[in-house]
C-alpha cells in the first residue's frame, strides 16, 4: 500500500445502492485442542479421559461468560466442533474446537479472548484432560465512513444510465454490524471509500442466496468503480 493514496471497496448489500459504511467488529481466531485418553467406551470408560466431555464443559463455561460482556462492545463468540472423536465405541481422546472472538474495539477483543481461553481450559481441568489454545490474528474493527461526494456522484450517474429505477441511500454511520472485514485493517492505514449494491435475494452465506439482478450486481457496480476512479483522478 506504500504507493496507494486511498482505496474504494464494495460489498453486496440489501439496498439497491448505498454509499458510505457503518462500523464492524474486529476479531481473533482460535483453535482449541483437547487431549484425553482413549479407552473402550462401554467396557472400560473409567480408564479413559473423555476429551469430548472436556470440550462440552468448556462450551458451557463460555456460555456463562455472556453476562460479563458489555452491550456497547458487541461481543460475538461462535465456536464449532470440527473434530468430536474417531469411533463411537472409543472414549474420545482428541477433540478440536474452532472459534472467532469478535468485538467492537481492541480492548474488548482482548478481554473476550482471555475469558474464552479461561473457559475452555476450565473444561479440561474438570475431567483431567489437557487443553492447548492457539490464537491467530484476524481483522481490526472497521470504522464508520460518511458517503464520499465523488462516489455518490458516480453512483447517481450509474443509476441514471440504467434502464431500471435504482434507489441510492447514504449509509447510516451510527449503525453497527457484528461481522468483520479485512477492510478494517486497511482503514487503520489509509482512507477507504465504500459502496454497496444489491441485486441479491436472501441473506449472505445462506443456502437460498442468489443473484437476481445481474445489471445491478455487476454492471452498475463496475460503472460506480470506474466513474469514482475517474472523478478522483481527474
Predicted regions and their residues:
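Histidine/acidic-residue-rich, glycine-tolerant segments that coordinate divalent metal ions
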Residues: 1-78, 83-90
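Metal-dependent amide/peptide-bond hydrolase catalytic core
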Residues: 56-234
Amino acid at each position: 500500500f506504500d504507493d496507494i493514496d486511498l482505496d474504494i471497496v464494495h460489498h453486496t448489500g440489501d439496498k439497491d445502492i448505498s454509499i458510505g459504511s457503518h462500523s464492524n467488529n474486529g476479531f481473533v481466531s482460535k483453535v482449541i485442542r483437547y487431549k484425553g485418553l482413549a479407552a473402550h467406551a462401554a467396557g472400560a470408560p473409567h480408564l479413559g479421559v473423555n476429551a469430548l466431555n472436556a470440550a462440552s464443559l468448556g462450551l458451557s463455561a463460555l456460555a456463562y461468560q455472556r453476562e460479563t460482556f458489555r452491550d456497547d462492545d458487541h461481543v460475538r463468540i461462535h465456536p464449532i466442533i470440527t473434530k468430536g472423536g474417531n469411533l463411537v465405541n472409543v472414549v474420545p481422546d482428541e477433540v478440536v474446537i474452532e472459534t472467532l472472538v469478535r468485538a467492537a474495539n481492541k480492548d474488548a477483543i482482548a478481554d473476550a479472548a482471555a475469558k474464552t481461553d479461561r473457559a475452555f481450559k476450565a473444561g479440561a481441568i474438570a475431567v483431567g484432560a489437557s487443553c492447548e489454545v492457539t490464537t491467530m490474528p484476524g481483522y481490526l474493527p472497521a470504522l464508520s465512513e460518511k458517503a464520499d461526494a465523488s462516489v455518490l456522484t458516480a453512483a447517481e450517474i450509474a443509476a441514471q444510465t440504467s434502464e431500471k429505477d435504482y434507489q441510492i441511500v447514504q449509509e447510516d454511520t451510527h449503525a453497527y454490524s457484528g461481522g468483520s472485514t479485512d477492510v478494517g485493517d486497511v482503514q487503520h492505514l489509509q482512507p477507504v471509500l465504500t459502496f454497496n449494491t444489491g441485486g441479491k435475494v436472501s441473506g449472505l452465506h445462506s443456502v437460498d442466496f442468489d443473484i437476481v439482478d445481474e445489471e445491478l450486481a455487476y454492471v452498475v457496480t463496475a460503472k460506480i468503480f470506474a466513474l469514482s476512479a475517474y472523478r478522483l483522478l481527474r
